[in-house]
């Protein structure tokens, strides 16, 4: 039985056309019992292992490595013989520099080592092995320890198999096309133009292998394969545990916080909250998730302690009372009738997933806190992969053919669907597309073939994993420049190891909210305390939104959003959530229906009275997933957990799955006294909207965040716009829009006066004084020098304009070129004098005062067009 043992996947970036799934399919199609992945990294190892197990193929995981021996590079293939061997590979993969072979051997445990070239073997080890009296050509297996003076390593730990006896083949492809594709990927990686096709190196099938290799050689190969036994299931991380009894600690925290909450809100139904809390804790403890909530609670407490602003909540976690009581979210799920089962359910074994929005400029601090608290080796950020999209694939392949300009034409006729295949394209009747394929079919075919191929690794924007012990025992890692670890396993495969994932998303809007509140809050209040005093029902805030005053408002700046705000005219957070939920692909098809019913009413008799209360607030239009869950619960008497499972099944658009759930739904609906006609109508209603339903929990969390920004803009507009001016300094278009909006708002703008101007814009007496950073052509060095001039201005008595100009031009002080000095004058930087001046003879005016033409021009407000012209016109 032959096994392809030296195989690269496409995680050896731009060096293979084979995904882990394709590797496994090759083995299946040829009835090979095993297959290997041996990239120079372990990015694809876990995906490969899981795919093999799902298809009854034996997975062999290896690492392609270049080591140094006597100042020569030697290519080795390290194969994990066991879970311990896989952990050894993890340790080696963490070392990101070339190893000397002696130091490598010191680390090898349960590893088979294969020399990748017999020529390399002979030239590199000839002297060593002759001295040891070993006949290479007659010895199918040699002990590496004897070759490199590491006698402590025994043959069960390190085995080096001579390739003359194994003739191990390196995988290239299934077909000629796949090998061609590999060559194109190689050329993309080194930015080369198209070369002559290389020799085809096929993925060997059983028949060919039997012809090429002797029985002894195949037996040696099978002997090695049989000794490789991986079961990564046994490497799954132990459950995260923070205390002796995390469940009891969590319950105590929640009960204490619930009592405080109810004491402040005496009118609430205490029993309803208590029952809800007990239900949630029961599910959380049953699934052993208490520690997860305690970690997030501790992180939130750290944020409050440091006055770091976190978001109002995102995703289905907003539907949890436990999360609300732990200050992880800000929306009361009982009052807003949110569904916990949408977040966590005993019907799903998924680990909880709480996404936390934090201030963008504090994310690194929060991550450092986690690494310090739980241990550097127990935490890691998560890898992600930048993959080819249709656009980038077409451009790169066209470049290989020296057809730089043709890519735009091809992209102009290609469908936007990222999943479309070349076969699909050939079957279309679009004449322009067919003409394109006739002329550039090879470019299109190759480009579509590499869509979704990984191009390089990167760091996931938010994900972090935390374990109870060292992650290196479980998964492969890399080390980042800041000494933090990065997983070599991407997000979608980490759940296999039972690792707790946390998402910390940096949000610039939270930074803005915090910065603005810092300017306006009383000195004895924190930012978080001030935020808690903001009324959620300020009608002036909603009026401004309806008046399309949404510049700088979270999620509401686009033209479409402004139009929808005018049409719906929200007056509450809940109505704002509807706006956010409707303005999405798919859901937008319901906007006209909703608007029409909102303003003109609708026939409620057309809706079964038993489900009318569920859809009444959205005028009979299904907008939220929670509505579907509640309808299914009422009609078919499902539990909330069952109803959410039903919703998930329907939204997947899997015909077989839909039919299976449909039968069960109808049976239970009839048992619950719904007739067939009504049930059919309701099911059709659900099926139509299920794919577009939005998560109400998420919509409310983000609606509150939108409201916070709108409230600050309405009540403290000067500070709000000041932040926008300073934040968007690099965007001229944004700056123009801000300045024009300032004028409409009646806020006065003044020039960056040289006697007090700061690099950034500042507020004084409710007026905005523009910053030096906004002046075109004035760089950081100029600003530093102008601050020297400013110091002299502030300390000089009997100040004269000629003094200031002299300091500006003096190479030891200001060193400002004359043309830039004139720019400062035009910008009004000298307007702090009683008079301003018209510089007729600019070259000599600062020396000879009689060359100055005095024109009385008191400091005055300029209109927006003046500032836009001066700041942004080159």
From Swiss-Prot:
Query: Where does the UniProt entry say this protein principally localizes?
Result: cytoplasm
Give the E.C. number(s): 2.7.7.7
Which molecular function terms from Gene Ontology are attached? Answer: 3'-5' exonuclease activity; DNA-directed DNA polymerase activity
Q: Name one GO cellular component term.
A: cytoplasm
| The keyword Transferase is annotated on this UniProt entry | yes
Mention one GO biological process in which this protein takes part, according to its record.
DNA replication
Subcellular location(s): the record lists:
Cytoplasm
Give disulfide pairs as residue numbers.
none
State the UniProt keywords alphabetically: Cytoplasm, DNA replication, DNA-directed DNA polymerase, Nucleotidyltransferase, Transferase
Superkingdom is Bacteria
Q: Which reaction does it catalyse?
A: DNA(n) + a 2'-deoxyribonucleoside 5'-triphosphate = DNA(n+1) + diphosphate
Spell out the Pfam families in the cross-references. Answer: DNA_pol3_alpha, DNA_pol3_finger, HHH_6, PHP
Task: Enumerate the Gene3D superfamilies for this protein.
Answer: Metal-dependent hydrolases
Q: How does it assemble?
A: DNA polymerase III contains a core (composed of alpha, epsilon and theta chains) that associates with a tau subunit. This core dimerizes to form the PolIII' complex. PolIII' associates with the gamma complex (composed of gamma, delta, delta', psi and chi chains) and with the beta chain to form the complete DNA polymerase III complex.
Q: What does this protein do?
A: DNA polymerase III is a complex, multichain enzyme responsible for most of the replicative synthesis in bacteria. This DNA polymerase also exhibits 3' to 5' exonuclease activity. The alpha chain is the DNA polymerase.
In the record, the note on similarity to other proteins reads:
Belongs to the DNA polymerase type-C family. DnaE subfamily.
UniProt-recorded name of the protein: DNA polymerase III subunit alpha
| Native organism | Mycoplasma genitalium (strain ATCC 33530 / DSM 19775 / NCTC 10195 / G37) (Mycoplasmoides genitalium)
Gene, per the UniProt record: dnaE
């Amino acid at each position: 039985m032959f096994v392809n043992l030296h195989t690269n996947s496409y995680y050896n970036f731009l060096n293979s056309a084979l995904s882990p799934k394709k590797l496994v399919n090759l083995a299946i199609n040829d009835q090979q019992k095993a297959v290997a992945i041996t990239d120079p990294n372990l990015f694809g190892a876990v995906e490969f292992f899981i795919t093999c197990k799902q298809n009854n193929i034996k997975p062999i995981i290896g690492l392609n490595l270049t080591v140094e021996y006597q100042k020569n590079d030697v290519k080795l293939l390290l194969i994990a013989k066991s879970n311990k061997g896989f952990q050894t590979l993890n340790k080696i993969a963490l070392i990101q520099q070339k190893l000397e072979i002696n130091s490598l051997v010191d680390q090898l445990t349960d590893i088979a080592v294969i020399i990748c070239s017999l020529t390399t073997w002979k030239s590199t080890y000839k002297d060593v092995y002759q001295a040891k009296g070993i006949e290479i050509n007659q010895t199918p297996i040699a002990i590496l320890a004897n070759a490199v003076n590491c006698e402590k390593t025994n043959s069960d730990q390190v085995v080096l198999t001579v390739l003359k006896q194994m003739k191990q083949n390196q995988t290239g492809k299934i077909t000629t096309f796949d090998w061609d594709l590999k060559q194109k990927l190689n050329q993309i990686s080194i930015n080369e133009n198209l070369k002559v096709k290389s020799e085809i190196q096929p993925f060997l099938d059983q028949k060919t292998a039997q012809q090429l290799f002797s029985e002894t050689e195949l037996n040696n190969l099978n002997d090695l394969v049989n000794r490789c036994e991986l079961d990564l299931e046994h490497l799954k991380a132990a459950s995260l545990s923070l205390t002796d009894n995390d469940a009891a600690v969590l319950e105590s925290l929640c009960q204490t916080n619930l009592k405080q909450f109810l004491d402040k809100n005496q009118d609430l139904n205490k029993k309803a909250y208590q029952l809800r809390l007990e239900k949630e804790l029961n599910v959380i403890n049953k699934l052993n998730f208490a520690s997860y909530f305690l970690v997030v609670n501790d992180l939130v407490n750290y944020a409050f302690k440091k006055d770091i602003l976190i978001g109002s909540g995102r995703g289905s976690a907003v539907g949890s009372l436990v999360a609300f009581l732990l200050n992880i979210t800000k929306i009361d799920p009982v009052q807003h009738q949110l569904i916990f089962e949408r977040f966590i359910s005993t019907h799903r074994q998924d680990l909880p997933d709480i996404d936390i929005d934090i201030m963008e400029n504090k994310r690194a601090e929060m991550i450092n806190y986690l690494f310090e608290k739980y241990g550097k080796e127990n935490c890691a950020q998560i890898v992600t992969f930048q993959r080819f999209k249709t656009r980038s694939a077409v451009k790169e392949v066209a470049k290989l053919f020296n057809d730089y300009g043709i890519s735009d034409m091809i992209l102009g006729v290609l469908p936007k669907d990222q999943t479309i295949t070349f076969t699909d394209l050939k079957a279309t009747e679009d004449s322009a597309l067919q003409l394109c394929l006739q002329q550039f079919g090879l470019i299109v075919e190759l480009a579509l073939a590499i869509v979704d191929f990984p191009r390089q690794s990167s760091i996931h924007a938010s994900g972090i994993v935390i374990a109870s012990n060292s992650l290196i025992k479980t998964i492969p890692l890399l080390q980042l420049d800041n000494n933090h670890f990065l997983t070599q396993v991407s997000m979608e495969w980490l759940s296999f190891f039972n690792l707790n994932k946390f998402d910390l998303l940096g949000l610039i809007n939270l930074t803005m909210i915090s910065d603005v509140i810092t300017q306006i809050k009383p000195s004895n209040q924190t930012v978080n305390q001030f935020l808690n005093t903001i009324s959620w029902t300020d009608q002036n805030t909603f009026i401004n939104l309806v008046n399309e005053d949404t510049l700088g408002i979270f999620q509401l700046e686009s033209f479409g959003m402004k139009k929808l705000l005018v049409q719906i005219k929200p007056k509450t957070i809940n109505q704002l959530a509807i706006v956010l939920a409707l303005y999405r692909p798919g859901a937008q098809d319901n906007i006209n229906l909703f608007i029409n019913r909102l303003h003109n009413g609708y026939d409620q008799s057309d809706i079964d009275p038993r489900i009318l209360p569920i859809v009444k607030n959205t005028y009979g239009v299904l907008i939220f997933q929670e509505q579907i869950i509640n309808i299914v619960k009422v009609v078919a008497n499902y539990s909330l957990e069952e109803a959410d499972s039903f919703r998930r099944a329907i939204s997947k658009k899997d015909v077989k799955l839909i039919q299976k759930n449909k039968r069960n739904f109808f049976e239970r609906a009839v048992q619950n006294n719904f007739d067939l006609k009504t049930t059919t109508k309701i099911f059709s209603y659900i099926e139509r909207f299920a794919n577009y339903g939005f998560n109400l929990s998420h919509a409310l969390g983000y609606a509150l965040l939108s409201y916070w920004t709108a409230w600050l803009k309405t009540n403290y507009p000067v500070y709000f716009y000041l932040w926008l001016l300073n934040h968007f300094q690099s965007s001229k278009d944004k700056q123009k829009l801000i300045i024009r909006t300032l004028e409409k708002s009646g806020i006065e703008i003044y020039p960056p006066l040289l006697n007090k101007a700061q690099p950034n814009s500042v507020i004084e007496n409710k007026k905005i004084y523009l910053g030096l950073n906004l002046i075109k052509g004035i760089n950081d060095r100029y600003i530093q020098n102008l601050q020297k001039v400013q110091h002299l201005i502030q300390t000089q008595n009997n100040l004269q304009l000629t003094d200031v100009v002299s300091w500006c031009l003096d190479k030891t002080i200001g060193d400002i070129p004359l043309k830039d000095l004139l720019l400062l004058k035009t910008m009004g930087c000298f307007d702090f004098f009683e008079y301003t001046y018209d510089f007729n003879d600019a070259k000599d005016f600062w020396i000879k005062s009689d060359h100055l033409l005095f024109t009385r021009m008191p400091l005055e407000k300029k209109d927006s067009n003046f500032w836009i012209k001066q700041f942004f016109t080159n």
